[in-house]
Amino acid sequence: MAIINMSDLDLQGKRVLIREDLNVPVSNGVVTSDARLRASLPTIELALAKGAAVMVMSHLGRPTEGEYNPEYSMQPVVDYLAKALSCPVRLATDYLDGVDVAVGEVVVFENVRFNVGEGKNNEALSKKMAALCDVYVMDAFGTAHRAQASTHGVGMFAPIACAGPLLAQELDALGKALDNPARPMVAIVGGSKVSTKLTVLESLSGIVDQLVVGGGIANTFIAAAGYNVGKSLYEADLIDEAKRLVANAKSRGADIPVPTDVVVAGEFSPTAAATLKSVSEVADGEMIFDIGPDSAEALAKIIESAGTIVWNGPVGVFEFDQFGEGTKRIAQAIADSKAFSIAGGGDTLAAVDKYGIADKVSYISTGGGAFLEFLEGKELPAVAMLEKRGA
């Protein structure tokens, strides 16, 4: 990939516009989860260290486009950055016709979604943004799958468009996991529905040695193997699809293992009583909420021998402890593995946090939808733009 990297550029005295993903939860004007802000700090600090005048932009929440709404203001982010960075940080509300920013200063633009044309990648808006800078830095992997004015259009018209360290790191890690993986390669794909992850499953079943399915997705594969799944969440209309994926994997010597034992309950609730059963013994009134210990051990062994691990989604309803043992065992196996491991997707990150294995995973992806689209083998518009500008 012929992408220019920000770290290779001379930014002394340059006006640098950085698109970050600073879309964080805010309550009563205070940021309540700062993971994305912390992830963006090294990029902003590097631009300052290189002698740049720094402008930062992002979306926050889903305001009505073109309408100012104080609920979605970037002010809480500005307050956070002002404490985290040892330099002046201020909010610019009216910036499209020009903004004063000095070397060593950080100006944060108000929510890009307050601009008419952001979502549709409007050319006039993109050109206005591009005119504000000497160098545009795309550093928001979490929005790289969206072709919008602040993530794509601006980069087409800026004098120079490059990848920030966070985005470059993300692309390197994903490339390492998918383009030239150390074998055996194992992918764990959980989630409630096959339909939402079908293209991911198809793409991965063509490259992995073992494809582990979990959650509601696994129930459809259990049903496809001829077992009763009771009242479990599953998709009857996708049973043939599941059979086809299993056959395709087998034809290339790969495997999609089905659990041999499961944890069931009669209702979905934090206090539901968990019962361990063989997969062949699920009754009509029961729902499968986790894999059993034998299945978890079998999967742990698969993970143990892996060279590359891609993890997207838990294997059970881990939010309730009685249905969390399967996900916990898998998390532990990934933590103990010497393989290159990459984890991504909201629920996955919650599991990584719950079981305290963040420092044992080789790379944790910041992008939800972008991570999935990369796994699907889709071209990410922002990455395509950077490749075009780098050529």
Swiss-Prot record:
Keyword Cytoplasm appears in the UniProt entry: yes
Cellular component, GO, one term: cytosol
The keyword Nucleus belongs to this UniProt entry's keyword annotation: no
Residues reported in the UniProt entry to bind substrate: 21-23, 36, 59-62, 113, 146
Any single GO BP term: glycolytic process
Subcellular location: Cytoplasm
Molecular function per GO: ADP binding; ATP binding; phosphoglycerate kinase activity
Domain of life assignment: Bacteria
Enzyme kind, highest EC tier: transferase
Entry's EC annotation: 2.7.2.3
Keywords assigned by UniProt, alphabetized: ATP-binding, Cytoplasm, Glycolysis, Kinase, Nucleotide-binding, Transferase
Pathway, per record: Carbohydrate degradation; glycolysis; pyruvate from D-glyceraldehyde 3-phosphate: step 2/5
Reaction(s) catalysed (UniProt annotation): (2R)-3-phosphoglycerate + ATP = (2R)-3-phospho-glyceroyl phosphate + ADP
Positions that bind ATP: 197, 319, 345-348
Principal cellular location given in the protein's record: cytoplasm
Protein family according to the UniProt entry: Belongs to the phosphoglycerate kinase family.
Self-association and partners: Monomer.
Protein name: Phosphoglycerate kinase
Origin species: Shewanella baltica (strain OS223)
